[in-house]
Amino acid sequence: MLVLAALGCREDAGEPTAPETTAPLAVAAAQALTFSKLSAGGGHTCGVASDLRAYCWGLNFNGQLGDGTTTQRLTPVAVAGTLEFRQVSAGLNYTCGVTTTNRAYCWGQGEAGNLGDGTKMDQSLPVQVAGGHLFRRVDAGDAHTCGVTTSDEAYCWGFNDRGVLGAGIIQRQSTPVAVSGGLKFRQVAAGGTHTCGVTTSDVVYCWGSDSVGQVGDGSNTAGVFVPTRVATSRRFQLVDAGLGAFTCGVTTADKAFCWGSGRNGEIGDGRDFLRFLPRAVTGGHAFDRVTTGGTHTCAVATDNRAYCWGLNAGGALGTGTSVARSLIPVAVAGGRFFSQVSAGKSHTCARSGAALS
């Protein structure tokens, strides 16, 4: 049976007594649910189960669990309604997902327009993103959301500080606007105040705040309002901007690189410096997936072992110790094999079992 494990979780752990945990523990009720995908957010976690329903647990002050209430849940609760999902993304205080019919829905905190329904209101039930676009996947950040359509076009909506929507404008948007440049994207990741994406030709572009180098173009300007190519010739298969001020990605050669704020070791190169250009993660591991949180990073290696690095607040690294931080990748305790790991603001969740399709 697949086990959903939580690291460094409290209310967001989905474990009945909700303690902080420094090593993986099974999420209560997950034994009755087989999850195919999961996403850790600010203080909540969501996943798609084998019945194609979305389930969430954790903090719920803004309705981010989508069950029609604002009551926190210590175990997974089904998102209200009959929608069937192929993917979900937990942001800081809200959640978005794509249904099996490629429609995007969001719920939770929406004062920045990040729910995409044309309002700036919180919603405790899923609301459809306006515009009629067919999305392949969406990604929820601090207060803005981005998605890639079935025709490989990128759209963003919500808070627009420092050009984080990538549309060449400064106003926040409560409905999707096209990312400038006409690029075709495979994937887009919404971060704290920046966004990055991988094109269909395996090139990484970033935009938004570049105050600590998270855009990766070698500068640290206040804001980048249109997609800017990251200064590297390497080809990438995926990128993640997380809920912090740094970015990580995995190349087509299965190597992890990070850039931006590294004050807590989240870059993984053995130093605690800012990095304005991509830096190789130390250790020589071959990675399939990487995920960035608020101040920590985790990744799944090609042998399905999980590693984390950065700040260990609340045990987010899953090492089984209370060490304050790690500047290099450390193995997640317990010897499990993982198919997916998702880093939230200060907690991490992972799915153990066979690789995801």
Give the ranges of each region predicted by the language model:
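Sec-dependent bacterial lipoprotein signal peptides
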Residues: 1-7
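Bacterial signal peptide processing site
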Residues: 8-12
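Conserved core positions of repeat-based scaffolds
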Residues: 44-47, 56, 94-97, 106, ...
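Short glycine/serine- and acidic-residue-enriched loop/turn motifs that recur at repeat junctions
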Residues: 55-75, 105-125, 155-175, 205-226, ...
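Short coil/turn segments at the loop-to-beta-strand junctions that recur within blades
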Residues: 82-85, 121, 132-135, 171, ...
